[in-house]
């Protein structure tokens, strides 16, 4: 379980997260939505120790993150898929996938490569194992990044707007891979996204944020058909109209 307890985050005098209380259960698919600047990405980055909270606690598997232990804990339990793919350009796809398992988890090359081939097949890129990232489309690179996160076999995968940097033509291929993972895997997924169709289909629970606060928490069927708050209704009215 990942828990945020009374989490506040400031950038200077700017209050970015305001008393966030949130728990993510094992195996849950949690989707965080809201307008730009609402604190969604900061929330998920706090979960992974990429941002230090100003006050409150972040707890991962009953371990409270602090500046001394956060790297060790998050490396053990959390994988992250970013807006931009962060693949090593001088390494092949296969080398990108086997680096962390071999270096950090001390897997043998044989075991790491077997796992890499398994997940390249899952994301539909088995034939791209020996090419370099620059030869791939944006959608393909993001699918490689997802496969890389799966190769670490960590219990939590956090997705920070994984389709926002993609061309419209390649967004669906990434969403399809994420849907497949959500249906076949017991992995806990936390997804920040503007893709409402994906949220409706995949999420066990929706978190709607605005101005650094959680405004509404609901199951998808209720949130999209009958949101509890006026702000959520206005947001959905605008975004679904487009």
Swiss-Prot record:
Amino-acid positions noted as binding ATP in the UniProt annotation, renumbered to this chain: 34-41
Xref: CDD domains: ABC_HisP_GlnQ
Keyword list, A-Z: ATP-binding, Cell inner membrane, Cell membrane, Membrane, Nucleotide-binding, Transport
Intracellular or extracellular location(s): Cell inner membrane
PROSITE patterns assigned: ABC_TRANSPORTER_1, ABC_TRANSPORTER_2
SMART domains recorded: AAA
Topological relation to the membrane, as annotated: Peripheral membrane protein
Residues in ABC transporter domain copies: 2-236
SUPFAM superfamilies, per database record: P-loop containing nucleoside triphosphate hydrolases (SSF52540)
GO molecular function, one term: ATP hydrolysis activity
Location, primary (coarse class): membrane
GO cellular component assignments: plasma membrane
Protein family according to the UniProt entry: Belongs to the ABC transporter superfamily.
Known role: Most probably involved, with PEB1, in a binding-protein-dependent transport system for an amino acid. Probably responsible for energy coupling to the transport system.
Protein name according to UniProt: Probable ABC transporter ATP-binding protein PEB1C
Species in which this protein is naturally found: Campylobacter jejuni subsp. jejuni serotype O:2 (strain ATCC 700819 / NCTC 11168)
